[in-house]
Amino acid sequence: MHMRTLRLAGALACASALQMPMKMPRSAAGRAESPRMIGSLFDILGGAGPQLIEPENALPGRKEKMQINDRHRVLGTKMDDVPEGHKVAVFANGCFWGSEKGIWRLPGDGITCTAVGYCAGFTPNPTYQEACSGATGHTEGVRVVYDPAKISFVDILRWFWEAHDPTSGMRQGNDVGTQYRSGFYYFDDDQKQLIEASKAAYEKALGRPITTEIAAAADYDQYGGLWYFAEAYHQQYLASPGARPYCSAQPQGISLPPFDTWAPAALKDAYAPKLGEDFWKQHAPAKGCSVVNSPNEPIVM
């Protein structure tokens, strides 16, 4: 029953994608029906909602890596490169189209490159259709290569929290399934401390429990790695010709409390925010996922 329920949920959430190579033909109205349809099926089958697949039941995957474009569509930087002195952040907060655009637009030249992909799952090199089925364990994610001399990890973290509803479990807006769960994955102890401390502060600000998955990137080495690039047509999708302005993220309109009130004392100097409150007053994520209709170019302050 568990596997049947999970696969039906994934099939409904990605019905069009299983029939076509891209998910752009799905209208927002069509996707809005998915939660109701899935809810009815769960009632019939006696399930409680999407549940993460067990590693031993995940699809086997493949050795071949996904082919992607060499350069970022907007920033022009190399997609699979981490320059010296740069760091990486990987997170998931809903449909990766809008999540990626919000991050690449952050000002100050600190964001060197972004990419969308499948993270925190158990199947090597999954396809979109496989990840969307719920049978790989992945969630739609964003990989950020950034220059810590120009933008703080805390700036990225704040955007992450404020750009979605981190309390919604295995869904984000009209998108339902384990592939839409919220998550942030750390590469060192500093990132771990900052993620956990900011979560506690934002949870208090929201007034309800946060369901965001927090885990070490190294936890997924046994499954081939944390991160796999998505297909080329998903990369910087909202900046591609003919892109449909779809975004299901649910910003709550609530700010992360001031850094000084929640940051671990030992990290306050090294990770002080570089984006000032003037930026957040003008460009903070707004209800309605306004990022989809914003310019493609990075914000200039």
Question: What kind of region is each of these model predictions?
Answer:
Residues M1-P25:
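N-terminal chloroplast transit peptides
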Residues T5, A28-A29, D147-P148:
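Short coil/turn segments at secondary-structure boundaries
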Residues P25-A28, E33:
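Short linear motifs centered on serine/threonine within intrinsically disordered regions
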Residues E33-M301:
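Flexible coil/turn and secondary-structure edge motifs
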